[in-house]
Amino acid sequence: MSKIEELPPSDTDDHSYSSKPGDVFLAFVDAPVKETDDILVEDSFIGGEPKWLHPDSEPPAELLKCGACKSADNMKLLLQAFSPLDDEQMSAIQQRLGINNMSYINPQDDRVLYVFLCTECQRKGNSVRCIRGVKKNKNVDSLSEKMASTSLEKDFQINPFDLSNNSDSKCNAFSSNPFGGANANPFGADSINSNISQSKDEGKKKESATVSAKTARKLHDLQKDKEYDGNKCFKSCLLYVEEETFKNKKPAHLQLPKNLKIDKEALDLTGDEDLEKDPIKLDPRTEKLSKFLDDDTFQKFQEVVGYNPLQVLRYDLGGKPLLYAETKVDILSTVPRPGYNPSSQRIFEMQLMPKMIFDLEEVVSVDNGMEWGTILVFTDVENYMPEFDEHGVGYVEECVKVQWESRT
């Protein structure tokens, strides 16, 4: 059974985006991968070459082939996302679905999602594939400690678009709860005196840390970008993650006037009668624009993305996808149960955003470029793995749904 299908536009309005602020994490491009960078399993990045969970443990060859042309020659990595699970979150999601099997959910396990695309078979079934990899981790270190150690080793996650340069808001959404271990009330009576006495020292330390981070970033940017074979890979960039907020104003170019009107003289019509009979009898480009303007789902997509237009990935485990266009059927009803675990079901986990195309392609081509609007990934809520190899590594294929860019 094909795990990918085109979701055609429809006149129905059965779906709406309902995730709330705080539910969603966004990934943005941080910096190009450099020749000196040591890519780790814990890194999340777009393009480049996959980092498998063990050097001697790769997925079965069949999973690395295009499901349409049955060849691996044109399969390129779009995304590698380090996405370990939080047991409390997964328990709550399972309970909501009436499922109770936490046997395969361990926050200490390495868990990675790989998304590949065949550049020669766009719009064909199974031309985009997602592989979920899990590596059993017997270390006693907690996930938060592991992530903290990783960030210390490679801390270039400075948002170049954040004028405040406050890196505290950056976190890894593919790890456990980024808000765990919150500080006690800073306004409590016991803390006031200590805060006053420590404010100067903390201010100096924070200033020093900011300078060090800026210096590290500048030194990193001066390094040579890693080169890839364009026939096998897209260029690669590391990602950083933030919680979704709507504090930014929507860009002006995404704001459509409410009193938008179409000038009859701009249309390819023979007269007023044609306009009255068929008000959307336009040239192909104008007709395509008109269809998008009439698509409330696409307008919602633009509205939500407009607050954070640089996002390349949305992560909303157990939530609902932000659809690119209206669909004839309920997407969730078309997501199959995992064949390797038929008693379970899949949940939405993440979606790739169209901004990623511009970051991956050196030259954007109208004729030969990528044509997807968004790529949705659904994964097994039980995180089941049929078997692990001698290195404690296992790989399975997960479900992908693609909404393609309209050609009409």
Curated annotation (Swiss-Prot):
Biased composition (Basic and acidic residues): 1-17, 199-208
GO CC terms, sorted: cytoplasm
UniProt name for this protein: 20S rRNA accumulation protein 4
UniProt miscellaneous comment: Present with 125 molecules/cell in log phase SD medium.
Function summary: Required for processing of the 20S pre-rRNA at site D to generate mature 18S rRNA.
Main location: cytoplasm
UniProt keyword Ubl conjugation, yes or no: no
Annotated segments matching region Disordered: 1-20, 190-214
A GO BP annotation: ribosomal small subunit biogenesis
PANTHER family on file: 20S RRNA ACCUMULATION PROTEIN 4
Keyword Cytoplasm among record annotations: yes
UniProtKB keywords: Cytoplasm, rRNA processing
GO molecular function: unfolded protein binding
